[in-house]
UniProtKB/Swiss-Prot annotation:
Keywords: Cytoplasm, Nucleus
GO cellular component, one term: nucleus
GO biological process terms held by the UniProt record: spermatogenesis
Domain of life: Eukaryota
Keyword Nucleus: yes
Name by which UniProt lists this protein: Sperm protein associated with the nucleus on the X chromosome A
Cell compartment(s), UniProt: Cytoplasm; Nucleus
Keyword Nucleus: yes
Motif Nuclear localization signal per record, residues: 37-45
Organism of provenance: Homo sapiens
Reported tissue expression: Detected in testis and sperm.
Length: 97
């Protein structure tokens, strides 16, 4: 039989026991041996939920200089104190179930 190298670089004259041709592989189970429980339903709130989202509209930068100038401006001014027309506000009310 030809010599085979092992991971350590030592030449072997016989294959490893795990490389035998007639070795059987153990079969894996096809079904879940530990099934997960179904997810629980979320508790419903007794009061309605109001979601408010604010984002800037018409906000566009065209050059790196404008990016730097606008970044400095944003650091000086509190976003809550900016002019209202710069922001769009969306309000969604989710009724109680």
């Amino acid at each position: 039989m030809d010599k085979q190298s092992s991971a350590g670089g030592v030449k072997r004259s016989v294959p490893c026991d795990s490389n035998e041709a007639n070795e059987m592989m153990p079969e894996t189970p096809t079904g879940d041996s530990d099934p997960q429980p179904a997810p629980k339903k979320m508790k419903t709130s007794e009061s309605s939920t109001i979601l408010v989202v604010r984002y800037r509209r018409n906000f566009k930068r065209t050059s790196p200089e404008e990016l730097l100038n606008d970044h400095a401006r944003e650091n000086r001014i509190n976003p809550l104190q900016m002019e209202e027309e710069e922001f769009m506000e969306i309000m969604v009310e989710i009724p109680a179930k």
